[in-house]
Amino acid sequence: MRRNVEVFINNQRVDLFDFEDINIVDSVQDVRDIAKIFVPYSREFTVPASKNNNKIFKHYYNNDIVNGFDARFKISAVIKVNGMVYKNGRVTLLNSSLKNNRPVNYKLVFYSKTIDFKTLLSDDLLEDMDTSILSKFNIEYNAQNVFDGFNYGYSLIGENIVANDVPVENSDLIIPFISTNSHYYYDDNVAGISPLEGDSESRNVNFNGGVAYPNNVVSGVNWKDLRPSLKLPILMQAIEEKYGISFVSDFFTTDAFNKLYIWLNNDKGLYGEERTVGTDFSEFTLDNGNDERPITTTSSVFYRLLLTVNIDDVNDDYELNVTNNNDSKTIYTSTAKGTNTFEIPLLFRGGGIYIYDLNFEITGVESNSITLSAKLELFSNGLQSTSNYSFVDAATDGVFNIRKNMPKVKVIDFLTGLFKMFNLTAYVNDDDNIVVDTLDDYYRKGSTVDITRFTKNEESTVSRNKLYSQIDFMFEEPKTFATINSNELSRDEFGNERIDNTNNDPELSALLAFDGGKYEVAPKFEKMQYERMTDQSNPTLLQNFCWGWCVTDDQKATLTKPILHYTENVDVDVIPLTVQMGFDPTTGQANIPVSYYFRPSNSLSTSTTLGQSLHFGSEEDEFYTSLGSNETSLFNMYWKNTILAIYDEKSRITTYKANLPISIANTIKLNDVVVVNRKKYRINKIDINITTGDANLELVTYRKLVRYNGFTVDNDGFTVDSTLITVDKTI
């Protein structure tokens, strides 16, 4: 029996063909592509070119109509079945068919309610989010304010950011012990020799009772080495504000997320001293003229760029490097002092066209105030047009602008990275909120639906999963000293994990049906390894000081991909290590004592308990090494069920045909457990004809979700053949 299906577009009822079926395909996460999120959509369907529909689609077939139907945009739509709302979403008009120059029909596709993040976020960077919430955390960057943030952190009270005067767990803004330039160590002997050989300045953090070191040796933590970290939930609030969206998530209330911080550093070296200012031309503001970006040259079209570097110190010397992001070629280099204008030719370099995506890097500057202005001249048989652009550096006026100091990453890549780390999935609820869950928790919230009597058992197919021969869980290539050297010494990759299903055995690889190839889960974040200090005079004695060093393996200041971290506000004078840390507020010799400081951490471990780590693989906590390897990894906590379900020997993909009643078709959810003939399945995909109720179901063998508890996993009788799936720590 055919059901009464209605389609409404912008609250207008669409005329339908009596014979036309509408099929909805629904899948949340395909087991054959473990990091791809799907959105319910319809197969193409046609509606008549009736008088009513012509009015709705504004005679789309006639492109002479002014202000006609704009098919570039999806239009709000609702599908009802027998008077009940089935799906809310949007419709895309694909085309209009004509016969003898008269309209016959319109072809449509329906998409369920969702958020098109790629369109919404476009190519926006985190630093593009000019929001009120982020502006509240801008602070004057000076020795006192840095000391306050390093000691106890800042909290948002009302509309104001206020320095805490006592330790506050999970402060909104902190300044962790991550150095952008200097090397740090502890030595009880203040006349001792630095343990480091190289160009970097080494500083002993021993407070030494506030007494200056002999021979005027600098010591203590230099405030200009430090940058703030912002609590990640605040950044998520900024994304909500910027794009008019709302996240609802139990996961966002967990410590694993709520205690995350993002390090705010997009400048090399000391703050305000010998720093690097880097920016892309795409980040300049167009002041007047036509926007010629991207700059496209041909054999008859070229450009000239007049770049003016405005610096407030006439004696500040620096080097300018201009490169093309498209091919990494150097376009222009020059050295100068003070304010200067540079003439940069942008000529055709062969091929049909040559496109310039310019990056400017100014190194060695000390000035706080730097602005760039650019005049772009277009030539084609002479000068044709001129456009003017400008850029203001983040450090202007001595204010640390939170937004402008965000790591250089697209908003979409930042969110995608979070989803990959914690195996998250998302959907839009009836209140237009974006519900975010870990995939495991999403499935745990489902119900059980028995559809046995509605299935056509004579028509079913059982097949196997496509298997990956190797799955790599990996962060970006490390750029920092400790991580690079650790990887070389251990022949391991810090924080990464590899699932190697061949055990590096060519014969086994030839026998097993690994037809899924290799797969990567690769968030665009970087891992930094931290170091707990020992006493250089007594290397067996650990100190309460743990820090990170943002320099390359040859000790040069560097920029990293985004770094996420946890933190612990450490009492530096705790028994038995009654040693105080010195803080240098003047870049001189006399220090002030630090009571507490924020140590950066890759886990939520405490002195007695290993907590959630930010590694895919098992690693020791750099501060609490005595606790041993931390198995509370991203893989164990968020990915293990997904992977084991794929490689379970009993795992099958079973397809059934069914005719689902309205009561089930309108309410079944993708996280429901489906029962057929007393066997449980998870839903991989549903393709349902909502007009007739006929459905094709692609189901995956049900496997009970297990929770990771400390060092053991209850697999409920499930075993993994060690020759089939192994964890390789040597990638």
Describe the function of each predicted region.
Residues 284-298:
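Surface-exposed ligand/attachment interfaces on beta-rich extracellular proteins
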Residues 87-95, 679-689:
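Short beta-strand-centered aromatic/proline hotspots
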Residues 1-285, 370-397, 402-421, 430-431, ...:
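Polar, S/T/G-rich
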Residues 317-328:
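Short, surface-exposed beta-strand/strand-loop-strand elements in extracellular ectodomains
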Residues 303-305, 346-365:
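Noncatalytic modules at the cell exterior or secretory-pathway interfaces
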Residues 286-289, 329-349:
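Extracellular carbohydrate recognition and processing domains
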Residues 309-319, 365-368:
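Extended, low-complexity, turn-rich repeat/linker tracts enriched in Gly/Pro/Ser/Thr and Asp/Glu
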Residues 706-731:
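Viral virion structural and adsorption modules
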